[in-house]
Amino acid sequence: MPGSPARPNFLVIVADDLGFSDLGAFGGEIATPNLDALALEGLRLTDFHVAPTCSPTRSMLLTGTDHHIAGIGSMAEAIAPEQIGQPGYEGYLNERVVALPELLREAGYQTLMAGKWHLGLTPELAPHARGFERSFSLLPGAANHYGFEPPYDESTPGILKSTPALYIEDDQFVEQLPEGFYSSDAFGDRLIQYLKERDQARPFFAYLPFSAPHWPLQAPAEVVAKYRGHYDAGPEALRQERLQRLKQLGLVAEDVQAHPVLALTQEWERLTPQQRAISARTMEVYAAMVERMDWNIGRVVDYLRRQGQLDNTFVIFLSDNGAEGALLEAFPKFGPNLQSFLDQHYDNSLDNIGNANSYVWYGPRWAQAATAPSRLFKAFTTQGGIRVPALLRYPELRRQQGQIDHSFATVMDITPTILDLAGVRHPGSRWRGREVAPLRGKSWLGWLSGETGAPHDEHHVTGWELFGMRAVRKGPWKAVYIPAPLGPESWQLYDLSKDPGEIHDLAKHEPAKLAALIEHWHEYAEETGVVLGRSPFQPD
């Protein structure tokens, strides 16, 4: 970039299942001073979109194209029979794409990673095989944050078998995690170590994808204690408090209507005192996980500041999907004996929740406190599943601090933006003798520098599909298809400029608009190779 003393560094930070309003800078009450500071020195994006779940988003982030092309057409843990063996449904980052770290390393960047991978479970599919010079990563989609695992046998539920504490450093599996291991601390430690050991003459690309605050909800007891009693009024009270702060901060419109809560669980008022206490404790632990993640982000940022590198580092933070509202015990894929197995091998008593030998999640009502005013949560193609908090800091591009931008953007834009800033050209359709997918995302460089408007105009079309859930957007108009029981199993139509909560279905009032959008979705599905199949996660 003209006038820059050196090629910029990059720090890409991903939270796992973070809700839209969890951060202080996005209306939350959780202590996140480090991310809040980045937001106040940079730019907050209020209409940033991802895939409905984790591994699809990660594949899009690192390739700039759609997850159906990149090999994660469905999550490997949830592939439908119709999808097995189909192109784009390999369950790992395939060879039809070139990964961002591969291109940056080829261009002289030092590529570093510490965090969750979820794009392949074997050494030949691990981060070091896709361009990272140094990497310490959790390979599966989740794991006990302390590395605790009871003995597994044929009775172990599928969800636990698919989420072992399987870590790899470069090309070697980690046989024994150190005493006192905690995922977020370990990722912060390792990335700082790699930054200290790096070749100072080369710019760096650092990828820091946390596995927090994904279930199982676990955090250091001293951090959990800070939130004792904070959530005793229940999720609906929290939802209203956060909505009010979102309005005060200018992140949503003053007159926004929030979508009603949709949940297969009892309302707070109908719970027993013990049930309320346990539910509130899970939220306390969740909050502590978010705070601890922020603390580790602060350690990395402080290191870069002390080294004089922060202002030459493009920092971007995002969540990989909406807040997690699933009731794990309701899904047959996770194993019909999940609850009995947890009762046998874990201690989920009130005083033990959050410790290494506990295993809990917080459910749909707390999730919808975090996704409001949007509809539903993770795994859905409604706004609650795909619209997430995102912020960036890079003084070279944004001179005004604390800005908020309501332009539409997508996770596929990150790779072309970073390549543009680094002065690296994407190879297009061929790389190292093989065909690769071109970019679908758009660079933000002109937009962020103020030279052009938003990267996606009102004619741009973006499609989504996962687990049979579908959506397509063109300008403010969005069509969405959600199967039963939490959707009508038919296409719905919304004008997000007037109805961001997806409350007022205009399908019957604007049939031509809906038909055009459905046609756009079919074009998207054909371009990307969508294969529809029933979701194994759908409740019986």
List the predicted regions and their residue ranges:
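Formylglycine-dependent
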Residues: 73-106, 118-224, 228, 233, ...
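C-terminal cap/loop subdomain of S1 sulfatases and analogous C-terminal strand-loop tails that border
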Residues: 133-146, 355-386, 398-498, 527, ...
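Short, solvent-exposed loop/turn and secondary-structure capping segments
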Residues: 21-27, 50, 57-60, 70-75, ...
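Short, structured active-site-proximal loop/turn typified by the sulfatase FGly-forming signature C/S-X-P-X-R
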Residues: 28-60, 64-69, 108-112, 130-139, ...
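Long, internal low-complexity/basic segments
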Residues: 1-8, 15, 19-20, 44, ...
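Active-site-proximal N-terminal segment of extracellular/periplasmic enzymes that hydrolyze or transfer
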Residues: 1-43, 52, 106, 117, ...
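Histidine-centered active-site microenvironments of extracellular/periplasmic hydrolases
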Residues: 122-131, 218-219, 302-393
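Active-site rim elements
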Residues: 23-24, 86-94, 174-182, 231-233, ...
